[in-house]
């Protein structure tokens, strides 16, 4: 049996997105300021997933425009070699959040080719005088014929964008890391 992973961000497990239950697969402190958690449906693996939810939480201030620009440029750089790469930016009506959604494709030497659709939601917050920055992302992969996969994902885009916009982000509290003494 898989050992239960404990959420460093105090997020309930499982979470539900787009009528699918996602279970915490990994929770890591990547640096002094970055905590990352990845959730996948029950019978999937990080190596070969169809859907993935990612929470990347920075307990420091990050400039929203910079984070958005970096994500957009990452996709734009792929566009030269990846004919399925395409990126869009959407600002929330109140201007407090941004969504970056994009398509990309991979044709690995070993393994199945896939097209992946990602939505990143960027949100700044503050707790106890401490500024924080959160990226919530959802990825959906379809393996196999790239043209079919791209068409199929494109048809889901509006629904998935609405689902992400309406998604109630859980309250995040960084668990006190044990110092190991």
Regions found by a protein language model. Give the residues of each.
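Secretory pathway targeting signatures of secreted, lumenal, and periplasmic proteins
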Residues: 20-60
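Short, well-structured beta-strand
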Residues: 101-179
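Hydrophobic/aromatic beta-strand elements that line small-molecule binding cavities or substrate pockets
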Residues: 38-41, 86-90, 115-126
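Short, hydrophobic/aromatic-rich segments at coil-to-beta transitions
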Residues: 93-101
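Mid-chain, structured segments of secreted extracytoplasmic proteins
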Residues: 49-90
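Short N-terminal edge-element motif at the start of the domain
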Residues: 2-26
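Sec-dependent signal peptide cleavage junction
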Residues: 1-5, 175-181
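Sec/Tat-exported extracytoplasmic proteins
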Residues: 26, 75-82, 164, 168
């Amino acid at each position: 049996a898989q050992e239960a992973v404990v959420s460093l961000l105090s997020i309930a497990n499982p979470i539900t997105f787009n009528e699918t239950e996602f279970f915490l697969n990994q929770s890591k402190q990547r640096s002094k300021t970055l905590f990352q958690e990845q959730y996948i449906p029950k019978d999937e693996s990080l190596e070969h997933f169809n859907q993935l939810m990612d929470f990347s939480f920075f307990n420091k201030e990050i400039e929203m425009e910079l984070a958005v620009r970096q994500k957009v440029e990452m996709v734009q750089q792929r566009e030269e070699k990846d004919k399925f790469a395409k990126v869009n930016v959407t600002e929330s009506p109140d201007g407090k959040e941004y969504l970056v959604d994009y398509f990309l494709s991979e044709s690995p030497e070993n393994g199945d080719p896939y097209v992946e659709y990602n939505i990143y939601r960027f949100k700044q917050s503050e707790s106890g005088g401490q500024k924080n920055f959160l990226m919530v992302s959802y990825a959906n992969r379809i393996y196999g014929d790239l043209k079919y996969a791209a068409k199929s994902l494109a048809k889901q885009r509006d629904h998935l964008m609405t689902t992400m916009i309406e998604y109630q982000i859980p309250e995040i509290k960084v668990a006190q890391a044990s110092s190991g003494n």
